[in-house]
Amino acid sequence: MSETLIKFGTSFQSKIIASLLSDKKFIQAIIDILKPSMFDSDSNKWLVKSIQDYYFEYKKQPTLEVLKCSIEEMDNDVLKSGVVEKLRETWKHIEATELDFVQKKTLDFCKNQTLKNAILESVNL
């Protein structure tokens, strides 16, 4: 079983990020088990980490304005350009009709990864 969300594709990953930004119940359910390393692109990893960092500090999702400010502070122009493009793509999915399906699949995937990692760690003890 793959440890990343690559098998679901880039559009699916954008919908996960859209869900993180738009659905309070989803972010509350998944914030502790979703890892940026599960995403395939550096841009998606950066977005997920930024959303998580903001959520852990302020207990709510960042707005588009907050993300824009964070992007402006980036030093890496190549990554900055990629993040802007991914955020545009993500924003197109904010009201996608299949977000419930995406959220369920993502939650199941993350729970399985967490369980798998816990089992592997216990074997190493």
Task: Name each region found by the language model.
Residues M1-F109:
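Noncatalytic partner-interaction/assembly domains of nucleic-acid and motor enzyme complexes
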Residues T114-L125:
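Short secondary-structure subsegments characteristic of cysteine-rich extracellular domains
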